[in-house]
């Protein structure tokens, strides 16, 4: 069971990084659009 848990943890970390990257890109896009609309 322990040997099976380790390979499962790696994809979870990759998914977390991709999720954080997606949130970051959405935040940047939101800031850009908000500044564009405010201007």
Curated annotation (Swiss-Prot):
SUPFAM superfamilies: Photosystem II reaction center protein L, PsbL. Coiled coil: none annotated. Keywords: Membrane, Photosynthesis, Photosystem II, Reaction center, Thylakoid, Transmembrane, Transmembrane helix. It is found in: Cellular thylakoid membrane. The chain crosses the membrane at residues 18-38. GO terms for biological process: photosynthesis. Belongs to the PsbL family. HAMAP family: PSII_PsbL. NCBIfam families: PRK00753.1. One of the components of the core complex of photosystem II (PSII). PSII is a light-driven water:plastoquinone oxidoreductase that uses light energy to abstract electrons from H(2)O, generating O(2) and a proton gradient subsequently used for ATP formation. It consists of a core antenna complex that captures photons, and an electron transfer chain that converts photonic excitation into a charge separation. This subunit is found at the monomer-monomer interface and is required for correct PSII assembly and/or dimerization. This is Photosystem II reaction center protein L.
